[in-house]
């Protein structure tokens, strides 16, 4: 039986050149399937607000939302390392709230680590949370909680000034104690440089093939998202028509009296 994955295992994978697989997950049955497939890391992302709740962005997601979905995933008892996103306003206002909310995701949610968006600006927060022995994954580049400042979901680091800022962000979060860093929406060459210079694993999403690992949203790879899928997404299945066919067949059989049959009934 596979043992539970730890942050030491993830760091060892970088050292040995083994790519790290990570997907978002928000519910018990999907977590079971992912773990059976051998996923290395599961992220309960605040993307749940977009793909599950139908919000236009991640900003409305609350701590209660994140704890609820983290609990659901953890009940599947995955061997994968479970990381929970800290949602907007859960760590930006003050250090006490940041520490408390990180602790809630561990204590109430059951996560093994938390993820925080930002670089130099959140380094003190990362340091404060890791001082509580809570592992932190940093997230730099295109940070969805900052979409209004960035003018939307735009690739970051394309000019020299932005690239230097991202290099500084990567150094800052590592120095602050993050055990891994997500690189989102940045040029592949810049991600490769950050990966080579970083002592911690890099997990890419729209950051090219040189990162130590990759993460995608589960609904995107299954073809279940109604909204536009970005260039970096690869669809591994198209389940929407499969689900639609099953629902349509059910409706038709109910209307025609073909379901339930004797085999679906009790004597």
UniProtKB/Swiss-Prot annotation:
Any Pfam family hit: Pantoate_transf
E.C. numbers: 2.1.2.11
Pathway where this protein functions: Cofactor biosynthesis; (R)-pantothenate biosynthesis; (R)-pantoate from 3-methyl-2-oxobutanoate: step 1/2
GO BP annotations, alphabetical order: pantothenate biosynthetic process
Binding locations of Mg(2+): 46, 85, 117
GO molecular function: 3-methyl-2-oxobutanoate hydroxymethyltransferase activity; magnesium ion binding
Cofactor details (free text): Binds 1 Mg(2+) ion per subunit.
Broad class of the protein's primary localization: cytoplasm
Localization, UniProt: Cytoplasm
Active-site residues per Swiss-Prot or TrEMBL entry: 184
InterPro entries xrefs: Pantoate_hydroxy_MeTrfase (IPR003700), Pyrv/PenolPyrv_kinase-like_dom (IPR015813), Pyrv_kinase-like_dom_sf (IPR040442)
Residues annotated for 3-methyl-2-oxobutanoate binding in this entry: 46-47, 85, 115
Keywords: Cytoplasm, Magnesium, Metal-binding, Pantothenate biosynthesis, Transferase
SUPFAM superfamilies: Phosphoenolpyruvate/pyruvate domain (SSF51621)
Co-factor(s): Mg(2+)
GO cellular component terms attached to this protein's record: cytoplasm
Catalyzed reactions: 3-methyl-2-oxobutanoate + (6R)-5,10-methylene-5,6,7,8-tetrahydrofolate + H2O = 2-dehydropantoate + (6S)-5,6,7,8-tetrahydrofolate
Role according to the record: Catalyzes the reversible reaction in which hydroxymethyl group from 5,10-methylenetetrahydrofolate is transferred onto alpha-ketoisovalerate to form ketopantoate.
Oligomer and partners: Homodecamer; pentamer of dimers.
Cross-referenced HAMAP family: PanB (MF_00156)
Protein family per UniProt: Belongs to the PanB family.
Protein name per Swiss-Prot or TrEMBL: 3-methyl-2-oxobutanoate hydroxymethyltransferase
Organism expressing this protein natively: Geotalea daltonii (strain DSM 22248 / JCM 15807 / FRC-32)
